[in-house]
Amino acid sequence: MDIVSAEEKLRDSLLQEQISQGRIELIRLLQNDKESGKSWVAIPKGSSNRYLKVATLKRVLRDKFNHTLILESKIKHDDMNRVIIEATLSHKNGGFLSSGLAERWKDSQSSNVQKQRAIECCQTAAWGRCIKSLLAVGYDISTADEIDRSTVSDINDIKEIN
């Protein structure tokens, strides 16, 4: 039988509260029509399907958790044609929280930014899936195609944040 210390109980309680506050903030942003194009995008354009931008997810993660969580990326596969990246979130004192996996096809000659900048786009998508997995906002998880359509503006937003 595992015995949970008072410190672990307190940390878990605080983590649950931070996750709850993060969800509340993201739901508020999704419901705000003025945040269209800034915090979320409609996919397909003009539809009622609202998807949070990765830059928004990262900002809320930083605002709610400060520096208590570690977001790491690991290249799982990288060759001439494609890249697969896994992002993981863990607590700074240890303990896995969530993960996200993304795959992108490469073509440096393509006019498609997703293929030209496959590693950057793949990492952005993996981050988004990882953070959304932790905060679990909405009723679905974006498909690769949906993420592809929204990642281009995310890349520019993340550059502004970092």
Where do the language-model regions lie?
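Polyanion-binding surfaces on beta-sheet-dominated domains and ring/shell assemblies
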Residues: 1-162
